[in-house]
Amino acid sequence: MPELPEVEVVRRGLQAHVTGRTITEVRVHHPRAVRRHDAGPADLTARLRGARINGTDRRGKYLWLTLNTAGVHRPTDTALVVHLGMSGQMLLGAVPCAAHVRISALLDDGTVLSFADQRTFGGWLLADLVTVDGSVVPVPVAHLARDPLDPRFDCDAVVKVLRRKHSELKRQLLDQRVVSGIGNIYADEALWRAKVNGAHVAATLRCRRLGAVLHAAADVMREALAKGGTSFDSLYVNVNGESGYFERSLDAYGREGENCRRCGAVIRRERFMNRSSFYCPRCQPRPRK
C-alpha cells in the first residue's frame, strides 16, 4: 500500500495540474471503486459534475481534493477523498492499461483524470469537511493522527502517547490513530535508523529513543519524497505514470540475507501482523525475554 511519501508525490502532481479546473464529466467504470460513497455512483457523478477543484490536501495515507460544488442554496465546499488501497493510481492523460481504469473525470481544459486500480481495493467518495484540532479535514479522515511531515506534528505529544502503550512499538507506529502515514516499509526504515527493534514494548522505551524513531521516520520519508517514493512494481506511480526510485536506498526493508550497511551483519526477516519485518540483529537486538 502506498505510504505517506508516495501519496504526497501524487498530491503534489495533482496540485500542479488540476487546481482551478472544473470537472465537466465523470464516468464510473467499476462500482467497487465508489463502494465507500454510500449514496452510490449516480450521486457521486452528479455532484462532481460542475465542481471546481480548489486544491489538494493529505493526511497520512489519505488524499483529497477540496471541491466547490453547487449546494441547494449556495455553493459549498466538500472533499473528494481518494483511497489508493493497494494499487490505486491517479493518472493524468493517457493510461497504460485502460482495463484497470475504474473512474474517469474530464476537466474543462480537456485533461482526463483517471483512477486506475488493478486490485480494486481503493476508491473515491465525497465527504463533508470538519474542523479537528485546528485543521479542516474530511469526516472519514477525522480520526487520523497528524503525520510526521505535518507542520503541526507534535513529536513530544506522540512520545507521551507511546509511553502509555503496552504493545510492540512497530504495532503502534502502524496505528494511524497514534501517528499517521507510516506503513510497513518506513516503519522498518525508521527503526533501523534509530537502532531500535520494533518488538520492544513501547512503554518500556525511554522518551529519547521513542523520539529518535519518530525523527527517523520523518527524515526517511522526506528522503523518499525527494526520490519520488518507493516503487517495487508498476502499481505505484505518480500522476504521469512514472515510478519512484527510493527502493534503491532502503537500508532494511526487503533486504533479507544482505549485509547491514552499518555493521555488516545479515539482515533478518520475521513475520509480523501478516506482514514481514526486516531488521539488523546486531544494530537492533530483540528485547530480552
Curated annotation (Swiss-Prot):
It holds the Pfam family Fapy_DNA_glyco. GO terms for biological process: base-excision repair; DNA repair; response to oxidative stress. This is Formamidopyrimidine-DNA glycosylase 1. Induction: Expressed in mid-log phase. Its EC number is 3.2.2.23, 4.2.99.18. Keywords: DNA damage, DNA repair, DNA-binding, Glycosidase, Hydrolase, Lyase, Metal-binding, Multifunctional enzyme, Zinc, Zinc-finger. It comes from Mycobacterium tuberculosis (strain ATCC 25618 / H37Rv). InterPro entries: DNA_glyclase/AP_lyase_DNA-bd, DNA_glyclase_Znf_dom_DNA_BS, Formamido-pyr_DNA_Glyclase, FPG_cat, MutM-like_N-ter, Ribosomal_uS13-like_H2TH, Znf_DNA_glyclase/AP_lyase, Znf_FPG/IleRS. HAMAP family: Fapy_DNA_glycosyl. Binds 1 zinc ion per subunit. Its cofactor is Zn(2+).
